[in-house]
Amino acid sequence: MKVNYTKRLLHFKEPAGTSRGVYTTHLSYYVIVEQDGVKGVGECSTLPDLSCDAMPESRYESLLDQACHFVEQTGGIPYEMLRPYPSILFGLETAFAQLDAKGSWALSSTPFGRGEEPIRINGLVWMGTFEEMYDRLEKKLQAGFHCVKLKIGAIDFDRELELVRHIRACFS
């Protein structure tokens, strides 16, 4: 079994405002597990100041190195070592799931897994101006989301309540 990872700097389509700041880029790691010519890929990803296992890049890569070495030596995931680091655990579990699926990207045969339907349970609306948030909210509601999460704190509280009243009016 061969295990390694690669990192990519991803760019948000538009700035993502949170209570901890605004994100324009996102560093993500992809773990690749290969056995008998079959590859499994899993994403290990955190958001600084939001994810419980966010840390300096060098420390994160050191943990990834240790986890990859363990997997290569044992053929298994070091669950106890990775419990405090759910992003790395998720990436390895996803890579193994794809490996078990003989390299197929279709990890589950569901409408979502086949790309036929989205999961409409958490439509996230990032912080922005009132108009930006209202437009994003409208798009989520039109897309059929039944649960919408608003990132609040960027605008006047009364204006944020206006957004909540709008949601309630749509479902009354």
Pin down the residues of each PLM region:
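N-terminal capping/lid subdomain adjacent to the active-site entrance of alpha/beta enzymes
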Residues: 1-172
